[in-house]
Amino acid sequence: MRRLGPLLGAAFVSVAVLVLLGSRRVVRVAVSGHSMEPGLLDGDWLIVDRHSRPAPTDIVVAWDPRASDRLIVKRVREVGTDSQLLLESDHPAHADEVIGPIAASAVVGRALFRYWPAARAGMVR
């Protein structure tokens, strides 16, 4: 019976992800690179809410202003009164790297949940 618990948990998460993806309110995004370590690792898959307004300390997915065909995953450092955002990495080696200001319209959404790998599944903070 103990083995059933993790299987039921994984099944619940899988169904929840499918329902959310079907609603088109959320999208899934893969983390690529090491700039958001230790919280997010290369290869993590995230559920991103496309309809939430970013706030300071949120982790967001945005179009990279340095390469407009690429998405980036970063933490919101600051939201200006003109809806311009400053983004930053979590990794200490990238501590002095600030991206922006970027328009709020360049933000795809706020990262809500890491669903893969299953062993690291949970809310994104």
Regions found by a protein language model. Give the residues of each.
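Extended hydrophobic leader/signal-anchor segments used for secretion and membrane insertion
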Residues: 1-125
